[in-house]
């Protein structure tokens, strides 16, 4: 009984081994047969080389028609007249200016409260989050225990206008105004101090408050 069982197991093992050997060889042979081309590719198998303008063959009547009927000229005139009656795509800058998004990131500014007190609490989150290390802050404690900045400098030549300072500020003190026209003649004029930033905030406060209100539902 044991001998019969052992012989049966050996036969099954031989069959499995044979199948494992046959299956890969059959598959590989089939792939090799169908993957190898039997002959040259058919005509037009590859994309032909595009012809140049001097190699294109055109009928004589087509050439004469384009020459005498001036079809290309009338086609260009039609395009010009079509664009003439459409509204213009351009504006007369700087006399006309396009709309600006409330999220536009322009010149920096420091805001105040309606009472005139500056908003910045010298938490230095903007200085820490600035990837360009363009912000420098120094602060001191007041008699009432509150902290206020004694120095707030921004090197506008380093700023990448990412808006991280504005997003990190817990009191909406440092913001980026909608002003994009602050080109200067010297590099020193782009080194903003606290007084310059506060004056920008006083100048653009109505626009800044409106932009913050428009963006408040999404914050």
UniProtKB/Swiss-Prot annotation:
Its EC number is 7.1.1.2. Binds 2 [4Fe-4S] clusters per subunit. One of its GO terms (cellular component) is mitochondrion. PROSITE patterns: 4FE4S_FER_1, 4FE4S_FER_2. Residues 111-140, 150-179 form the 4Fe-4S ferredoxin-type domain. One of its GO terms (molecular function) is 4 iron, 4 sulfur cluster binding. [4Fe-4S] cluster 1 binds at residues 120, 123, 126, 169. [4Fe-4S] cluster 2 binds at residues 130, 159, 162, 165. The keyword Ligase does not apply. Keywords: 4Fe-4S, Electron transport, Iron, Iron-sulfur, Metal-binding, Mitochondrion, NAD, Oxidoreductase, Repeat, Respiratory chain, Transit peptide, Translocase, Transport, Ubiquinone. InterPro entries: 4Fe4S_Fe-S-bd, 4Fe4S_Fe_S_CS, NADH_quinone_OxRdtase_chainI. Its cofactor is [4Fe-4S] cluster. Complex I is composed of about 40 different subunits. Core subunit of the mitochondrial membrane respiratory chain NADH dehydrogenase (Complex I) that is believed to belong to the minimal assembly required for catalysis. Complex I functions in the transfer of electrons from NADH to the respiratory chain. The immediate electron acceptor for the enzyme is believed to be ubiquinone. May donate electrons to ubiquinone. This is NADH-ubiquinone oxidoreductase 23 kDa subunit, mitochondrial. It comes from Neurospora crassa (strain ATCC 24698 / 74-OR23-1A / CBS 708.71 / DSM 1257 / FGSC 987). The gene is nuo21.3c.
């Amino acid at each position: 009984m044991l001998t019969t069982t052992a012989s049966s197991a050996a036969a099954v093992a031989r069959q499995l081994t044979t199948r494992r050997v046959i299956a890969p060889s059959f598959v590989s042979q089939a792939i090799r047969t169908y993957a190898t081309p039997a002959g040259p590719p058919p005509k037009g198998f590859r994309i032909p080389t595009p012809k140049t303008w001097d190699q294109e063959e055109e009928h004589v009547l087509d050439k004469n028609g384009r020459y005498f009927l001036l079809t290309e000229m009338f086609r260009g005139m039609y395009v010009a007249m079509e664009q003439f009656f459409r509204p213009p795509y351009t504006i007369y800058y700087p006399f006309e200016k396009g709309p600006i998004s409330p999220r536009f990131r322009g010149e920096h500014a420091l805001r105040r409260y309606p009472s005139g007190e500056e908003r910045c609490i010298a938490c230095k989150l903007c200085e820490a989050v600035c990837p360009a290390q363009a912000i420098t802050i120094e602060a001191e404690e007041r008699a009432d225990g509150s902290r206020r900045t004694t120095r707030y400098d921004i090197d506008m030549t380093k700023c990448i206008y990412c808006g991280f300072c504005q997003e990190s500020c817990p009191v909406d003190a440092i913001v980026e105004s909608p002003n994009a026209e602050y080109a200067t003649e010297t590099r020193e004029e782009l080194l903003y101090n606290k007084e310059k930033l506060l004056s920008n905030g006083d100048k653009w406060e109505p626009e800044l408050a409106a932009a913050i209100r428009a963006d408040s539902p999404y914050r």
